[in-house]
UniProtKB/Swiss-Prot annotation:
Pfam families named in the record: Cystatin
Keyword Disulfide bond: yes
GO cellular component: extracellular region
Organism listed in the record: Bos taurus (Bovine)
Signal peptide residue numbers: 1-20
Keyword Metal-binding tagged: no
Keywords tagged on the record: Disulfide bond, Glycoprotein, Protease inhibitor, Secreted, Signal, Thiol protease inhibitor
PANTHER family xrefs: CYSTATIN-12, CYSTATIN-12-RELATED
Annotated protein name in UniProt: Probable cystatin-15
Amino acid sequence: MFWKLPLLLGLLALGPHVCSWMFEDIGKTGQEFSMCVEFAIHHFNEHQPDENAYKLLWVRRSQHKKFSLTYLMDLHLGRTICKKHDEDIDNCPLQEGPEGKKVNCTFIVDSRPLYTKFTLLNSTCQQI
């Protein structure tokens, strides 16, 4: 029975350190976060079969892991009239009517801005 007490105390001591690796809210305008958003949208456009490009409509959630450069983002994307390899997709008009698809995506991106290296750890998207 008493052998459980040191184990419990050890778990209590580790609790804050374990929780520190959870995602926490951050601002949507930070430079590293913005670069990760750009990378995630580029990756989405490159790996989806549609030849039209999607662009960012708004950021629904912006978070990062404490003490790391791993970012979690929920993005709302809209289908444009531009092709995915066109220049300046951000200024491209959205498609109207039944072709005007929108998707909600969640991306987890690990960044190494010093090396300009980004890695997509996970992504899920759902058409709305």
